[in-house]
Amino acid sequence: QADSKQRSIYFFHSNNERNLFLTTFDEALVTDCYRREQSIVPQQALAMTNSRLVLDVSRPIADFITKVLQTRQGDTDEAFIREAFRYLLAQQPSEPELQDCLKTLDEWQKLPEAGKDAAATSFARANLVWVLLNHHDFFTVR
C-alpha cells in the first residue's frame, strides 16, 4: 500500500468481521447508529503527512503551478498561493490564510536547506503544496 497512488481505502466492516486496521483510524462502530462528527487521531494525521505519495508529488505540482503563473499573470508568491488553493482545494484563501502563507513562504525560503534564489522559492512552494495536500478540505468529500 505504500506505493499506491490511491488515497482511499475501502473495507467491508461488519460486527462479525471487524478490520483491526480501522481501530487505528477512529473506526465507526457497526453496532451503533449515529451521525459521525469529524474526528482525527494522531496516527491518521501522521500517515497522511508522511505519505510517500504526498512527498513525491509536492514538487511537481508546485512546479506546474509556477509554470502556469509564468505564462498567465506573473509569478509572485501571492499569485502562487491563490492558484495553489484554487487548484488543490477549489477555493480561494481567506485573508488571514493568505497572510499566514506569505509569511510562511518567506520563512521557508530563509532556511539553510532551501538553497538560494530560485531553489529557495521552489523549496518553499513545494512545502506549501505539501501542506495543502494534507489539508482537511483536500481529502474530505463533503
Task: For every predicted segment, state its role.
Residues 54, 77, 81, 97, ...:
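Hydrophobic (often cysteine-bearing) scaffold residues that line and stabilize catalytic clefts
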Residues 113-117:
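Intrinsically disordered, low-complexity Ser/Thr- and acidic-rich flexible linkers and loops
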Residues 1-88, 92, 132-142:
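An acidic, gly/pro-interrupted, aromatic-rich
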